[in-house]
């Protein structure tokens, strides 16, 4: 509309998949499924794609996996639309961005359960000082500086399919061991998953030793792909940490000879709520767990999700 409301989106993608099909349909699918949903006010959309064989190398998975190409096209079109409407491209986007609670167009009918895209746009506008730099500035000596921006989204694994598992235990020295099936391929997932456990257990990151993927001994994980590890394996790690924390309190209460609901755990000691001077250190509890107690201080948990909640991104650039 003339006031900047996007009523419909029509996207066509042509994908060169090389000499073999392999990831052809899924890659081209994401060019629409990870771009159209950004504009939640659209009342209708059409997404058509063709995948063609050529004599090029086979095309497979790479970071972004089709989403980046679709996003470049859609975001470029939105910027052109803003120019035709004589409207600030950020203002145009803020009128149309998907909101929490919206059914996302072209995203399998999923409801957007968590979203701060509009706030992300505003933050980027502030960071690049958009109000003083848009659309362009004459720097003299024939130089012009201009600013531009765009939005993006991804997913968090393949819904209903990806599986992540983790094993977490308390050692007799009061430190923790986290065993995961996810492979750290430079993404830092060993650190990320340890941070999740450390937050639940109220302990320093250095108190957790991570043993990465070893198919002979690690719990099962379907793979480190599709931006799934932090969400899927991370949730399994959180489940482990919550159960382990509960059992630490239970054993601590047993050693203090009081009910489990009468104690608290601060990451270092389990203490009686009514009398904090009565306490057992984590080392005491870990040591006691080795002597015939029926309370396990080791848990393995698995997580999968029927949804693939999208993280959102906004970028801006100043070019000369």
What are these regions (language model features)?
Residues 1-76, 153-163, 308-309:
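Glycine-rich loop/linker segments at domain edges
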Residues 2-11, 38-40, 70, 77-79, ...:
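Structural beta-strand/beta-sheet cores of well-ordered domains, especially the beta-sheet scaffolds
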Residues 135, 260, 272-310:
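Internal maturation/activation junctions in enzymes
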């Amino acid at each position: 509309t003339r006031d900047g409301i996007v009523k419909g989106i029509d996207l066509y993608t042509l994908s060169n998949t090389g000499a073999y099909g392999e990831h052809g349909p899924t890659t081209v699918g994401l060019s629409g499924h990870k771009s159209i949903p950004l504009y939640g006010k659209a009342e209708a959309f059409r997404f058509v794609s063709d995948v063609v064989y050529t004599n090029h190398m086979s095309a497979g998975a790479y970071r972004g996996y089709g989403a980046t190409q679709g996003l470049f096209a859609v975001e470029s079109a939105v910027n052109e639309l803003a120019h035709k409407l004589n409207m600030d491209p950020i203002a145009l986007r803020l009128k149309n961005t998907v909101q929490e609670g919206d059914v996302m167009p072209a995203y399998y009918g999923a409801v957007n359960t968590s979203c701060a895209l509009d706030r992300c746009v505003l933050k980027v506008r502030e960071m690049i000082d958009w109000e003083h730099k848009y659309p362009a500035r004459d720097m003299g000596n024939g130089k012009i500086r201009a600013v531009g921006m765009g939005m993006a989204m991804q997913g968090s694994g393949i819904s209903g399919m990806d599986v992540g598992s983790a094993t977490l235990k308390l050692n007799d020295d009061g430190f923790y061991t986290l065993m995961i099936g996810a492979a750290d391929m430079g993404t830092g997932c060993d650190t990320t998953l340890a941070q999740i456990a450390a937050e639940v257990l109220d302990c320093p990151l250095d108190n957790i030793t991570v043993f990465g993927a070893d198919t002979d001994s690690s719990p099962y994980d379907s793979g480190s792909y599709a931006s799934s590890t932090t969400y899927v394996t991370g949730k399994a790690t959180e489940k482990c940490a919550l159960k382990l924390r509960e059992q630490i309190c239970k054993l601590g209460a047993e050693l203090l000879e009081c009910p489990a609901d009468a104690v608290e755990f601060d990451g270092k000691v389990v203490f009686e709520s009514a009398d904090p001077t009565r306490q057992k250190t984590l080392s005491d509890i870990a040591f006691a767990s080795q002597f015939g107690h029926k309370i396990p201080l080791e848990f393995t948990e698995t997580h999968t999700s029927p949804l693939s909640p999208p993280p959102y991104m906004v970028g801006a650039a100043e070019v000369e």
